A protein has these predicted regions:
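N-terminal membrane-proximal hinge/A-helix region immediately C-terminal to the signal-anchor transmembrane segment
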Residues: 3-112, 117-126, 141, 145-157, ...
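Conserved cytochrome P450 K-helix E-x-x-R motif and the immediately C-terminal K′/meander segment
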Residues: 44-59, 63, 340-379
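Cytochrome P450 heme-thiolate monooxygenase catalytic core
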Residues: 97-108, 142-315, 331
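Cytochrome P450 heme-binding "Cys pocket" and the immediately downstream C-terminal segment
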Residues: 193, 326-328, 428, 440-484
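Short, small-residue alpha-helix embedded
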Residues: 310-323, 450
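Conserved cytochrome P450 K-helix/beta-meander segment immediately N-terminal to the heme-binding cysteine loop
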Residues: 393-424
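C-terminal helix/juxtamembrane-tail motif
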Residues: 484-500
Length: 500
């Protein structure tokens, strides 16, 4: 009997080895030499000063698809090839998010649309169908009233904070306040623009920098374990006391508490089918059994954290670029004096598009091949990849490809969105590779309204001494930090002058 088990075990090992060595391999793909079996390139990517600099160097050397090392000797394909990205995100056969991306996002947003993949079929379709009316044209018009009210409070708050007519202001602090207060559309006022300090707002200010600055080798390895551990034991990692997991769970618990308070303060549905804001829609879905309480909490958590953080960060980078290129502020003011319809202002929209291109709020997205597949590449070639292959889909690199955007792809030039049609279409907005395409119209309207109000009332410029602004590496959201002051969290000091 023992001999029989030895034979069976040997046969199983032989079959496993045969499958392993016969499976498609990406070892032949060029890329930077791996620095460590245990850490690959994950440590050097976290240690770089400016997110994207190292990846840009590799892209110039190895092209729009290259191989880098992950933890435990894993091969990770870095992808910014337009054809390959179109294939990965195609709605008919989407690649799912990687297990570590889903796990990390789930810690602070729950199982809302932020992590429910299109490949999950019925769940994704059901959630999208329920939430779509919240982003209808009628609801967007209602939202614009809220955007305007909050942007007016923002303008008044900045003015009242001045001792004179100009001052150096941490713009990141104010953009965070206004985008959080816009959540007052839930009929739940955070009042941060009125000086109220909420526990959640304070925690989110340092959400990504505090938890992900200078990670130890052990912390990187523990997070990388998520990619290879079976789902049945992933929950145990919540008990692992890494800074990142501790911080994200803490913020997630605050967001969940806030989501419950929001729903508890909302009365039963009083609007007819097809009308009402997001809260009405979620309450209606709960009342008819289409959504459970944990799903509703997750949608609110996603909007509170992910929606607030992405919008606030995008506005911050936009104001930074307009401070650097201050001559563009006068062009926007001239447009605003001629029209009150934001969509009819070409330069206002061009600077928004250009800022989202240069500063995608999410640097990259980690996805996994659901099966052995042929990945189409630009130029007509294909690459065979194995099931389970990890792909790092880089929005940062794609949005700076010279073959798409021209020789000045890494420079600020809003005119590119005025002068020519774009050659391919990956994103739903201006060919940009961006997160949360399903709520992009709402996000753009929010940016238009706030930017217009700020530009009409203030002039932005770089402060004395011009501190160096860096893109914080290692964070899922690319937040600005001041060189040498990363420990203070996300910041953007600008000189702000009140216009007469």
């Amino acid at each position: 009997m023992a001999a029989f088990f030895i034979v069976v075990a040997s046969l199983a090992v032989a079959l496993l080895l045969h499958w392993w060595f016969k499976r498609p391999s990406v070892k032949h793909i060029k890329g930077p030499p791996s620095l460590s079996f245990w850490l690959g390139h994950e440590r050097v990517l976290r240690d770089q000063d400016n997110a994207g600099d190292l990846e840009t160097k590799w892209r110039r050397e190895y092209g729009t698809l290259f191989r880098m090392g992950g933890c435990f000797g894993q091969d990770v394909l870095v992808v910014c090839d337009p054809k390959a990205l179109e294939h990965v995100f195609h709605p008919s056969h989407p690649y799912p998010k990687s297990k570590d991306a889903v796990f990390i996002l789930g810690l602070f947003t729950g199982k809302g649309l932020g992590i429910v993949d299109t490949c999950l079929g019925e769940t994704h379709h059901r959630q999208r169908k329920i939430l779509n009316p919240a982003f209808s044209p009628a609801q967007l018009r209602n939202s614009q009233v809220i955007f305007q009210q909050c942007s007016d409070k923002l303008v008044n708050g900045i003015k009242e904070s001045f001792a004179g007519t100009d001052d150096t202001v941490n713009v990141r602090d104010w953009t965070g306040k206004v985008t959080l207060d816009i959540i007052a559309s839930f009929r739940y006022d955070f009042s941060t623009l009125d000086g109220q300090k909420t526990e959640l707002g304070q925690a989110m200010r340092h959400l990504f920098t505090a938890s992900q600055a200078n990670p130890s080798a052990l912390e990187l390895i523990l997070v990388a374990l998520i990619r290879i551990l079976p789902d049945s034991v992933l929950g145990l990692l919540r008990l692992v006391p890494t800074r990142e997991i501790r911080q994200l769970i803490s913020v997630g618990n605050m967001a969940k508490k806030t989501a419950r308070e929001i729903m508890a303060s909302h009365n039963e549905v009083q609007t007819p089918e097809g009308n009402g804001d997001l809260l009405d829609i979620l309450a209606r879905a709960r009342s008819v059994g289409k959504m459970q309480d944990d799903e509703i909490e997750a949608q609110l958590m996603t909007l509170i954290i992910a929606g607030h953080e992405t919008s606030g960060t995008s506005l911050t980078w936009l104001l930074y670029e307009l401070a650097v290129h201050s001559e563009h502020q006068s062009i926007i003011r001239a447009e605003l004096k001629q029209s009150n319809k934001y969509d009819s202002m070409p330069f206002l929209n061009a600077v928004i598009k250009e800022s989202l291109r240069l500063h995608p709020v999410v640097h990259s997205l980690m996805h996994t091949a659901p099966h052995d597949d042929s990945l189409p590449l630009s130029g007509g070639k294909t690459l065979t990849i194995p099931k389970g292959q990890t792909l790092l889909c880089s929005a940062y690199l794609y949005n700076r490809l010279p073959c798409l955007w021209g020789d000045d792809a890494e420079e600020w030039n809003p005119a590119r969105f005025l002068d020519k049609a774009l050659p391919v279409s990956l994103g739903v907005y201006a060919n940009l590779f961006a997160l949360f395409n399903w709520s992009m119209k709402c996000r753009i309207m929010e940016m238009q309204t706030i930017l217009a109000n700020l530009i009409l009332h203030f002039e932005f410029s770089l402060p004395d001494g011009c501190p160096e602004i860096l893109r914080f590496p290692g964070s899922p959201v690319v937040v600005p930090v001041v060189k040498g002051k990363v420990h203070l969290g996300s910041q953007l000091p600008l000189r702000v002058r009140v216009l007469p």
